[in-house]
């Protein structure tokens, strides 16, 4: 049976006006928040505890940092044009800077999906997996 994850009803306040969507693979589906505005992209998941983290998509994002994070996260790098996973960096601890795979990712084509630590593996999100993205 496929794994399904939904966003909690009591999302942190910073996500109140953010867009939401669902990603589906052959084995899983999960909801996520879309960080499409600068203030939300800047703040992201920083300052949230492990139990408060939610999946967060950062469109047009070739690098991420975990400065200000209180818990480890997974980052799944997506090719936005093909909706395919390029790579996954798992269990990234706070105070790290990570770039998308490849020497120079195509500008605007890469997206980063931040997840609570362990979620990428639990949802079967690895290189080569195709996602079907559905706006909520």
Listing of model-derived features with the role each one plays in the protein:
Residues 2-136:
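Compact, glycine-rich, soluble single-domain proteins
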């Amino acid at each position: 049976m496929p794994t399904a994850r939904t966003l909690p009803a009591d999302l942190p306040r910073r996500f109140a006006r953010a867009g939401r969507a669902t990603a589906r693979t052959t084995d899983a589906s999960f909801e996520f928040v879309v960080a499409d505005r600068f203030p939300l992209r800047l703040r992201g998941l920083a300052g949230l505890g492990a139990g408060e983290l939610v999946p967060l998509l950062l469109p047009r994002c070739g690098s991420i940092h975990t400065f200000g994070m209180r818990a480890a996260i997974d980052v799944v790098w997506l090719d936005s044009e093909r909706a395919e996973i390029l790579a996954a960096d798992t269990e990234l601890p706070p105070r790290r800077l990570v770039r998308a795979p490849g020497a120079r990712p195509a500008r605007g084509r890469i997206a980063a999906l931040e997840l609570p630590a362990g979620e990428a593996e639990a949802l079967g999100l690895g290189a080569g997996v195709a996602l079907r993205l559905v706006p909520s």
